[in-house]
Every structure is written in C-alpha cells, then in structure tokens.
Amino acid sequence: MTRRLILLRHGQTHYNASFRMQGQLDTELSELGVRQAHAVGRVLAPRRPWTILSSDLRRARDTATALAAEVGLEVHTDPRLRETHLGSWQGMSHSEVDEKWPDARQQWRSRPRWSPPEGESRIDVAQRTRAVVDELVEQSPEWNEHPAVLVAHGGAIAALTAALLELRVEQYPMFNGLGNACWVQLSAHPRAQGSPGGAPEPEVPPVTDTARGLLWRLDQWNVGITPPVGEQ
C-alpha cells in the first residue's frame, strides 16, 4: 500500500513580501496570500485528501482552512509543525541580520546543526516534524493513495522532507526555496525485507514501529499554481 503525503507551504505574508524573518511570530496572510490560499485549495481539492493537519500559526492555519472548505474537512493543528524558531532574528529584516551577524545566515543555511542565537537548528525542526508524520502513520491504517495534507512553513517543510528521505546531514541544505502556497509530495512504500545491513542510522530516524517499515520517496518538489496567483 502506498501512502501519499502533501506538504503545503502557507500563502504569502507581509513579512515574506518585505524579506523579514518570521520564525514563530504569528503573522497573517497578506491580501495576495489569502488569494493564494483559496487558489491552492481549489487546485488540491480534486486529490481528495482524507485529513488536513496544520501548524497552529495563523498563516498556516488560514491556508489550511481554505483547503478544508473545498473538501469538507476539519483542520487539526499541531504546534510541532511550526516554523523554525529563529530566536534573536525574529522580526528582523534580512539586511538587519546580516549587519549584526555577518555571514550568519549563510552558516544557518549550509549547516543543519547550526542555530541562530536562542533559536533552533534544522535538525531540531526535522525531529519534531518527523514525529508528527510517524505518529500519523502509526494511527492511520486506512491511509492510502488519497493524500494526507500537512500545512506548514518553508523551513519546516524542507527539514521534514530531508528527514523523511533519510538524508545525511550534509545533504539537508539541498532543499530550500519553497514558494508561498507551493507544495511537496512524497509517497511511502513498504521497505524491502532482508535488505543488506550496515547502512548508517538516519540523522533523524523514525520514531514508531510502523514508520520504520516504510521508505519515503520524493514525487514532487516546489509545485505551484500555473500561472502564479497575481499573474493571472
């Protein structure tokens, strides 16, 4: 049985538009972001998701609610799907961070164990978000090719994708640049029995027995509406 998972990033916020570091600040969708949320809801509805989980931050929750209205589902929230906590950077513009901490943003993007002052690393985020998916696998034997949709944030989705694919830590930075109201699709397949031993333990291993028996594959990355909302 194949399980499909869609990871959807929230619509645009004013912080996105002005290149400010949001992290776990509870920002709202911009007018464009609201339009993106409704548009992506209409696009994903024909895939008939069976459940919708969302970060409890407003920008993700409102995006999830737009999809839920199209398919007649409730939105279940989980704070573990929040964006990376950016510590002292939260609320600052990119240029303000670069002025106060030269080269720090590059360190943050290229070193998954590195964290901003008083913030989280990408590995921290991968651990808490992976647990959400593994628990969903464990609790949902009915999960089939109709997708579960998780609505979250760019950094959180990048970290979760790398964790589900069991990448080495130095490979985590390959996932970045997920657009607003764009999504990732992965599929989980039974892991082959009797595979050769000696493989290294994943940086962020599965946390439930059922999840340990699955191998996730990347089907789509950074897929969005065509043409983008605002250009239609």
Give names to the regions the model predicted:
Residues L5, W143-A152:
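Generic beta-sheet signal
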